[in-house]
Amino acid sequence: MAKMPLSVVVFLLFSAAFLAVSMAEIKSLVISDDARPMILFEKFGFTHTGHVTVSISSVSVVSTSSDPNPEASRLGFFLLSEESLLQVLLEIQQNPRFCVLDSHYVTHLFTFRDLSPPPNSRFNQSYPVTSPNEYSLFFANCVPETKVSMAVRTEMYNKDPNGSKDYLPAGSTQLPTLYSFFFLCYVAFLGFWSYTCWTNKQTVHRIHLLMAGLLLIKSLNLICAAEDKHYVKITGTPHGWDILFYIFQFIRVVLLFTVIILIGTGWSFLKPFLQEKEKNVLIIVIPLQVLANIASIVIGETGPFIKDWVTWNQVFLLVDIICCCAIIFPIVWSIRSLRETSKTDGKAARNLSKLTLFRQFYIVVIGYLYFTRIVVFALKTIAAYKYQWVSFAAEEIVSLVFYVIMFHMFRPEEKNEYFAVDDDEEEAAALALRDEEFEL
């Protein structure tokens, strides 16, 4: 094997250790003129009834070295468990020319020596996984200066007691039921919110309608996720539900960030329109969320086998961090403005109650972002592969709690201290906004 660059070793460690388990377990892809010494296809949690099927066709190996006929046994597919990953990396670091196909820590599937002779050059075989574990499917090219082209079809599944195939990993087979349950929770939440708005029509503002829309989109996103995982579970492919899932996920994320920003600015119930700097936050966040969702689709629908997969992960992470920071600014501006206003307008008690509410909202938003971005990732990393569903459940529970708290704090109610703004306050705020003197 050619000397493996350190970056490839890091990529192998990062991708196999932290790659989220694949969700569409029948995949077809094309590799064209690829010279990478190792390609990670996907990750899957197997039970003792697990199977993996790999089909390749239209295989060609082009050598740019003096040897036009590379040794076929030095190119092949294998499975690698997470426990064995560090051992393989240690072998590679000790001997950069070491071929991973020679390691006794990997589960060999086949090499190019098993292919049918040209011009067909194809292979199709199913393998039982007798040792339950979470495995990563790799292709290794241990021949220096060679480029490989091939069409690859992979199929991974576990068998249920009744003999049917379950294409979801061992730790994700509960997801259809989980998402269906939270869909019902949000439908009930939407019904209760609609009733609350109806019974308090006099204090309903445009932001409350956006909040209702957020609940509706979140519900649709969850039912699409449930159907997506259900069809993947029984057939191996999402049957188009993944398209609807990504559409509603995009709308939900953009709407959630928009609602948080607008609540933080006090739009519609504290002032009738936004200042220029608040509009700029929306102008920045919404396009970034478009980019983040494009990255999410590329990450979810392809895999680490594409050359730019790590780059897309980095783009998604960077954009998400920027958006999370951006939505904090309007809340901070509002807190600062209320603190300054309370010193001069003679309404210290009223401003103090609003200031307290904004501080509480700030803490709630920070807690939500911290848990969903850091704690959930930690759960996915440390949880055993059979219990990956726990991290998804934790994320949905925290999201639901966040929605309930946020909606309760800013509900349409006569006695809600945040909305109880008398006429002279509204006129003063509108005048200050027109003069661009009301810093928020």
From Swiss-Prot:
Induction: Induced by the N-acyl-homoserine lactones (AHLs) N-3-oxo-hexanoyl-homoserine lactone (3OC6-HSL) and N-3-oxo-octanoyl-homoserine lactone (3OC8-HSL).
Membrane topology: Multi-pass membrane protein
Cleaved signal peptide residues: 1-24
Knockout consequences: Abolished Gram-negative bacteria-mediated promotion of root elongation triggered by the N-acyl-homoserine lactones (AHLs) N-3-oxo-hexanoyl-homoserine lactone (3OC6-HSL) and N-3-oxo-octanoyl-homoserine lactone (3OC8-HSL).
Ranges annotated as spanning the membrane: 175-195, 207-227, 243-263, 281-301, 315-335, 363-383, 390-410
Main location: membrane
GO biological process: G protein-coupled receptor signaling pathway; response to molecule of bacterial origin; root morphogenesis
Organism: Arabidopsis thaliana
Carbohydrate-modified residues: 124, 162, 351
Alphabetic keyword roster: Developmental protein, G-protein coupled receptor, Glycoprotein, Membrane, Receptor, Signal, Transducer, Transmembrane, Transmembrane helix
Family under the similarity heading: Belongs to the LU7TM family.
GO MF assignments: G protein-coupled receptor activity
GO CC annotations on file: membrane
Function: Plays a role in plants and microbes interactions. G-protein coupled receptor involved in root growth mediated by the bacterial quorum-sensing signals N-acyl-homoserine lactones (AHLs).
Compartment list: Membrane
Protein name as catalogued: Protein CANDIDATE G-PROTEIN COUPLED RECEPTOR 7
